[in-house]
């Protein structure tokens, strides 16, 4: 099991990193906005600051929702730092982008996963990580942990290397 922090707050990241147990950080546009980070250049600079703190993977999410846009942003983000993992939504265009980026050696984190079927698509496309929305499922009276259990079991049975972040 790995410990990832879901935040863009540098103080929280420093504090968790000081414990010596932090394996990585995941971010998203909402978390960046909450920290007052604006624009693509502001986000890129912030990702670099996070990478300087953490000796582990840092998920940086694309803003585009079309294949071409996700691929373009994904390449740009991946070129910032070796620890950047491109976070892409689990939509049809996102699965195509994950597959394309995988072919280019770019690591990805497939987010907005609500079902084992979506997790299967992400793994088949070559995602490094998959991020099921456990909290959201729990909020709507679904069992988020059960989803994680099903995904982990499926990946184990079929030999997928994709890791589950929950």
State each model region's role.
Residues 1-3, 21, 83-85, 106-108, ...:
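Short active-site oxyanion
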Residues 82, 86-130:
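Hydrophobic, well-structured mid-protein blocks that either form specific transmembrane helices
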Residues 107-109, 120-166:
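Catalytic alpha/beta core domains of metabolic enzymes, predominantly
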């Amino acid at each position: 099991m790995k410990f990832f922090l879901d935040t863009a707050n540098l103080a929280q990241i420093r504090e968790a990193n000081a414990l010596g147990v932090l394996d990585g950080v995941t971010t998203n546009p909402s978390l960046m906005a909450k920290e007052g980070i604006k624009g693509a250049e502001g986000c890129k600079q912030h990702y670099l600051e996070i990478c300087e703190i953490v000796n582990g993977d840092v998920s940086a999410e694309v803003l585009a929702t079309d294949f071409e846009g996700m691929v373009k942003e994904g390449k740009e983000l991946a070129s910032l730092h070796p620890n950047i993992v491109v976070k892409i939504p689990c939509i049809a265009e996102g699965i195509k982008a994950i597959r394309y980026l995988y072919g280019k050696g770019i690591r990805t984190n497939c987010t907005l996963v609500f079902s084992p079927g979506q997790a299967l698509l992400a793994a088949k496309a070559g995602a490094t990580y998959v991020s099921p929305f456990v909290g959201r499922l729990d909020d709507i009276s679904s069992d988020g942990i059960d989803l994680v259990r099903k995904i982990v079991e499926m990946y184990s049975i079929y030999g997928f290397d994709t890791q589950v972040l929950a």
